């Protein structure tokens, strides 16, 4: 994550070919434009730039203003996570957290997640612990 490129060591260990992987791009990079065919099918204007974009977690972070180093947020839906915005990866030796690329260039979102958060909240509601 420090070099913003695929790990050749991991790719070789998995016995894969680096040429199978796409170029690593920033979320704000223009990667193409709407073609005439896509414009006809979608109603979008031909030539409209297509931006690389980002994943749901880091886009949610932008939505709540978590864009500067040291800011954090908590997401609660079907799953739940707490994420922080940082410039360098935070490595948890026990692997309880992971680092995601932020949509803000050069930033990362180390986060910890619970995959059954929504179900847990629903169970508590059904047990009448919440009114």
Where are the regions that the model predicts?
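Active-site core segments that coordinate phosphate-bearing ligands/cofactors
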Residues: 1-15, 30, 36-131
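Short linear loop/turn motifs
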Residues: 22-30
